[in-house]
Amino acid sequence: MFSSDEVDEKVPVFSDNRVNYILVYSGSFNPPHIGHLNFMRESLAHAGHDLHIVGALFDPRSDDWLRSHKNSDLILPHTTRSRMLLEDKRVSTGVWRSPERDGIAKFKLLAQNYGVRVRFLRLLSAETDTGLDDRSGKWSKDFDGILLNTYGRHSSGTFSIPSLSKDPWNTLHEPGDAVYRYQRMVTNDRGTILGFLRVITRGPDEKTSLISSSGVKSLAKVIDAKEMECSNLLREIVLGWSTLEVDETWAKWRAVQMHNRNAPEFREAKGTLEKSMKDAWELEKRNCHDE
C-alpha cells in the first residue's frame, strides 16, 4: 500500500496493450475494520478475469463529509483513518489509500506519466442506493464503471438472480464460478452511455458480514482501559489498531465514555455487545476460510 509520498516511487504492473483498472472503495472507515478489508478482497477475487485490475484504492471520506453525513459522536481525523489503513499488515501491497487533498487525481497523473491507459471502477456494497435508474442523476466523471458486490450486506430483495437474468442484463459468469456476474450499461436521459454496472453475487447463498464501525464504537464505549488492553478482540477486528491507540481524538472520546461507563445502561449493554462482536468476528473468519 502506498502513502501519498510513495505513490510516485511504487507503481503497479501496468499493461501497455490493455486497459488497466483500479478499484476504488470510498467509505467512512470510522474506524476501518476487517469487514472492510474482506469486502475489498472478495470483490477483487470475483470481479471477473476480463477486467485487468492492477490495484485497489481505499478512499476515506473527508472529515467535513463525515460531520455532515454521519450522526456520530466520534469522527476520527482523515489522517488517522488513512494511517490505520496504511499501517495494517493484513492489507496487501497492491492496495493503496487515497490522500485527502489529491484523491484519485494523483493516480491519474501517475498513469499519464507512464503513458498507459488507466480507468477507475467504483466499488459499492448492496446496501448502497446507487440511484442509477434516476437518469437525471449525475455519473461521476472519474469512473468508467461500478462494481456492486452483494457480499456481506445482502437481502432477498437486492438484485435477485431472476431479475439479473433478464434484459438489459448480460450474463458474464461461467460454469463452476464461485459467484454470479451480471452487467448492464448505464445511460443518461439522452441515451448516452455513462458507464457499466457489474453485479457480483451468490444470490440466496450470499455470505453475511456483521462487523460494523458503529459496532466497534459501541463496544469501545463500555469497556475500560484494562479490559481493552487484555482483550485481543478489537485489536483483531480494527485495522491499524496501534495507530488508533495513540490518536488524540480517540483518547479524548474514550475519556468521555469512561466517565459514563458506570451508568446502568452501559453495564447491561456490555455483555450483549461483547457477545455480538465475538460472534461477528467468528463469522468473518469462517467467511474467509471458505474462500
Regions found by a protein language model. Give the residues of each.
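Nucleotidyltransferase catalytic core that binds NTPs
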Residues: M1-E291
